[in-house]
């Protein structure tokens, strides 16, 4: 069990890291010659924390967007209202139900996951349209666990400009969100990608984020769980890379000589 001193040190480190992230976001936006940032708001803890960082980095030039599809966010709007009250972030709602239904019908995709992944990809396209309209960068909400596991949609929620919390484990996200006074209901909500009704991350993965946190911080966990986590990481390596390219023609020519 950690002592009070250790807990205080960890919280102080997280608070300092949060301050660093705010300055990092400012720097990256400045380097890109942009005016601010935009973030998709789901009602979950990851987007709530990124919303806090966005507002702190750009009090006048930050925007949150909710993008419900069907009933995917019907239970989240009360939490989003609390987040808006806390952060004072401007949050607008863009209902993508009709757009999704039309695209899904046109594509006529039968595979359940392929069809579900249209949702985050449609949201990505919407975020970038709004970001370009405002001359903003898009902030992603993937944490370290999700990034390591590849637990995101390629060119969906993984298609962003900046990933501010991608080096924070789930438990660290929770702790920093608590420091920023994010509502308890958001913090305690079961993690879900929202790809279909009643979907829960940990049920789909087959292990908990707590176990992933321990694995990522080099702590002891069940060897079978560790093997599953590492296998998931290896299988999703392509998600963390830009499109794979062949050998350069000059290198090819030199190799053939």
Swiss-Prot record:
Residues that bind ATP: 40-47, 141, 170, 192
GO molecular function, one term: metal ion binding
Keywords, sorted A to Z: ATP-binding, Ligase, Magnesium, Metal-binding, NAD, Nucleotide-binding
Enzyme class at the top of the EC tree: ligase
Cellular component terms per the entry's GO annotation: cytoplasm
EC number per UniProt: 6.3.1.5
Binding positions (deamido-NAD(+)): 121, 154, 161, 238-239
Family: Belongs to the NAD synthetase family.
Biological function: Catalyzes the ATP-dependent amidation of deamido-NAD to form NAD. Uses ammonia as a nitrogen source.
Name of the protein in question: NH(3)-dependent NAD(+) synthetase
Originating organism: Mycoplasmopsis pulmonis (strain UAB CTIP) (Mycoplasma pulmonis)
Lineage: Bacteria, Bacillati, Mycoplasmatota, Mycoplasmoidales, Metamycoplasmataceae
